[in-house]
């Protein structure tokens, strides 16, 4: 996905809770135990997204630093810390995902909305 498209990305669908940290993500970084991170199939790495639970209305800013989910019906995998922050437990949840920014440091581009 190109940067302009990524900055306008917004989708509602299924999220699954995965990986409680310690493993190496797609960017070569160790996923932090208890950290707020996510995996997405097409957004540029790294990106920051807002994940909002459709059920609770709670939201959380999340760093996308891994690839997945590998289940076709799911749009994002979230860490257990993200699930707790949006009022969800383990399992599959309906969420809305909106891009806040793409890239890190001087290369970061923010959504203008």
Segments predicted by a language model, with ranges:
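Secreted/periplasmic proteins
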Residues: 1-113
